[in-house]
Amino acid sequence: STRKESSAASDVYKRQCYARSFDNGVTWYKANGKKYDLPIRLGNAEYACRIPQNSELINQTSMSADAGGNPYIASYWRDPDSDVPQYRIVWHDGQMWYSRQVSGRTTPFSLKGGGTKMIPMARPRIVVDGGEIFYVFRDEERGSKVSLAHATDVANSKWSISDLTDFTVGAWEPSHDTELWKSRKRLHLFVQHAKQGDGERVVEFACLLYTSDAADDSLRVD
């Protein structure tokens, strides 16, 4: 989870903390298997990554785990000496926490401001197979396409980034068939072009509507 300092501020997320439960939230454990004394507070939380406030840290991102149950967290934030947020991965190898930059972005932006932001980079989605990482994202820098960062070794491999589509998906946020990945290790993405106005503003948008009946079997743009 990301810690939120105050709901009244506009850029308040900081730190990434970790806890897991095997009984639907009755008991909670740290990455090393140690049981939490509830409630979880600032003083007893396990910190996966300490991130300063006002770092453009995004909330509600994706997690995965390897065969040993070690967690991998996909997120983005910016370094204190930069105004460019970068995609990151945070993981636990069974002994300690690590973090690594995934992207090499050059475009600055800020999450500050009222309402829901039209964000130029999507919340990433991650899946892990052994030590192999598949990191799905959408970035305005790459034409807002469906993009994939891949590494065969999370700690040492160079990231290979490619676009999976040759068309824009607008404000799409990555999602995948979690059950198919869990059962067969096949990564199927749900893709739909989407739009969002900054601060809940309305935007014009066309969609395809398929009508199928005896009188009208057609595809049209609405």
Residue map of PLM features:
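Single conserved hydrophobic/aromatic residue that forms the stacking wall/gate
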Residues: 1-9, 13, 210-222
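Entry beta-strands of beta-propeller and related beta-repeat scaffolds
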Residues: 7, 68-73, 130-135, 183-190
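Structural motif
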Residues: 11-17, 81-88, 141-150, 196-209
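Asp-box/BNR beta-propeller loop motif
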Residues: 21-32, 89-99, 103, 151-161
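Surface-exposed loop and turn segments in beta-propeller and other repeat-based domains
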Residues: 31-54, 101-117, 168
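Signature of short aromatic-glycine-proline-rich micro-motifs recurring in repeat-based ectodomains
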Residues: 46-65, 114-128, 173-192
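Loop/turn-rich, solvent-exposed surfaces of beta-rich toroidal or solenoidal domains
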Residues: 75-78, 85-87, 114-154
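Conserved blade-ending motifs and adjacent loop-strand segments that build the rim/top face
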Residues: 101-121, 157-182
